[in-house]
Design a protein with these regions (language model features):
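N-terminal Rossmann NAD(P)H-binding glycine-rich loop of SDR-like oxidoreductase domains
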Residues: 1-17
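Conserved glycine-rich Rossmann-like NAD(P)H-binding loop of the short-chain dehydrogenase/reductase
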Residues: 17-34
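Hydrophobic/aromatic anchor residues within beta-strands of the central parallel beta-sheet
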Residues: 51, 91, 114, 154-157
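Conserved Rossmann-fold NAD(P)-dependent oxidoreductase catalytic core, especially the SDR/UDP-sugar
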Residues: 71-74, 78-82, 86-134, 138, ...
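Conserved residues in the N-terminal Rossmann fold of short-chain dehydrogenase/reductase
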Residues: 26, 52-53, 93
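NAD(P)-dependent short-chain dehydrogenase/reductase
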Residues: 126-129, 134-214
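Conserved Rossmann-fold cofactor-binding substructure of NAD(P)-dependent oxidoreductases
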Residues: 50-71
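Residues in the short beta-alpha loop(s) of Rossmann-like NAD(P)-binding domains
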Residues: 28, 38, 120
Length: 218
């Protein structure tokens, strides 16, 4: 139900891929309700859509949600850096343990391919968010070695800040522009940015081309 998820699903629906169903798995009841009431994601207009309330921390629920599923795009994460520093236990439960639950559920249910969304902050991490995503990346890549004879692959798509996504800097800059000034941390600071459409294109490419063990970067 986040920025990426909505854009990704809209792309799939527009391209009319021959899928039987798309399961939208998230823990926020309100966001799911609002999304399901939208004309873009209404179950009456799109019979393939299914809305599941659940949390990646809850392995039992995740197991149920991924039964008879061929592909998983794992985008659940706590990603606000300051919040993560103040709530480290919660970040670990979602970003690391939650990722492990996705891996185990995928293997148990014979999923064909799993793509996990990562971040440039996982490279030489300097905060808990980056460190937790690095751990998650390691879990997904190494899972290609523990799957046994099951025909399942795990890959990672690692990109930077997605422009316009919830919690990104661009909406904040737009607000500041209305006040006539920009508050920045350092003049030498740089950010790696891609658009939502570019992020979706990367995941589509990964679904079509990865064989397991790759970390895809822009």
């Amino acid at each position: 139900t986040g920025s990426f998820g909505k854009t990704f699903i809209k792309y799939l629906l527009k391209k009319k891929y021959p899928f039987k169903k798309i399961i939208i798995f998230s823990r926020d009841e309100l966001k799911q309700h609002e999304m399901s009431q939208s004309s873009d994601f209404n179950e009456k207009n799109f019979k393939q859509l299914r809305y599941f309330i659940g949390d990646v921390r809850d392995k039992d629920r995740l197991n149920w949600a991924t039964k008879e599923v061929d592909y998983i795009i794992h985008s659940a994460a706590l990603k606000q850096v300051p919040t993560g520093e103040y709530n480290p236990f919660e970040v670990i439960k979602t970003n690391i343990v939650g990722s492990q639950n996705v891996v185990e559920s995928a293997i148990n249910n014979n999923v064909k391919k799993v793509i996990s969304l990562s971040t440039d902050k996982a490279v030489s991490p300097i905060n808990l968010y980056g460190a937790s995503k690095l751990c998650a990346d390691k879990l997904f890549i190494s899972s290609n070695n523990i799957k046994g004879k099951k025909k399942i692959s795990f890959s990672v798509v690692r990109y930077g800040n997605v422009m316009g996504s919830r919690g990104s800097v661009l909406p904040e800059f737009l607000k500041q522009s209305q006040r006539g000034y920009f508050k920045i941390t350092d003049k030498q600071m740089t950010r790696f940015n891609i658009s939502l459409s570019e992020a979706v294109d990367m995941v589509i490419w990964a679904l079509d081309n990865t064989i397991g063990g790759e970390i895809i970067v822009p």
